Amino acid sequence: RRVVYVGAYGYENSRLMQNMSPSLGNNMSSSPAVYGMGGGDTEVLGRLKARFQSLAQLSSTMRMLVLDIEDSLNAQINTIIEHEKFQTLEARWMGLASVVWAKDYASNVKVKVLDLSWQELEHDLNYTSEIRKSLLFLRIGMQELDTLGGEPFGILMIDHELSMSLETDFDELYTAQLLCRLGETCMCPIIMGAGTAFFGESDAAWYTDTRRVTSVLGSGEYATWQRLRALPNAQYLGLAMPRTQLRGRYIDHDIGFLFNQTPAVSEGLWGSAGFDFIRTTISEYQRCGWCGF
């Protein structure tokens, strides 16, 4: 308590320095240096006078302590916000917030959030005998589309990047086929993201090279993908890519002290392009009452 309070800049700190000044004599019993400590003030001031030769030395030491505290806070916050799990959480909430803010300009649009992980979604769709018996159909189809007075969903976004990895519990491309059935049954298009390495390329430059795209997607590795695209109900599933930047790197960000995000090469926070697609859909619906263009 004493260290933190002595290291603070402000009214109490200035009075502490005044009481240490030789011009004020040795009467230090009324010093308010440590709030609520009563007679302990004299002991504190005595120890400070014994340790520091001048007010300038004390002030310099206090400033160094404050800088050390700020460096420690910077390091701790960077450790938190650079963690993969925290970035996923932050990106999800920032993306959702951008949709809610866009909705503010469209009073006839409702945004509903279902707290369901991708793993729970996979289990729900893969373990049910038919789509109409799944939890998702109950929430999206039966309770809204198939209920008198219900409010059918116009579009559903899943904040998950589709992957072709074989290390997952379920084949994600097969789960995507089940999502196509769900979208068709509920008459609700579904938007997802695609992983950065889904098409074997990590940069966005190749998207405009049609010959390269045709060569990649026509290879044997993407036979399952081609079968998915050939399904009649595949029109109910869309992938939005690449990822989009939600915020830049924090530089001299004022949060009570100046916070700088490291490493310096950090490009900030990136999230699913599905949120951008949803905002565009809301804007189009607000413009003409239809989101099919």
Regions found by a protein language model. Give the residues of each.
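A glycine- and small-residue-enriched flexible loop/hinge signal that marks low-structured segments
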Residues: 2-54, 81, 101-104, 115-116, ...
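Extended assembly-interface regions of large multimeric machines
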Residues: 52-56, 60-130
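Glycine-rich oxoanion-binding loops at beta->alpha junctions
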Residues: 131-140
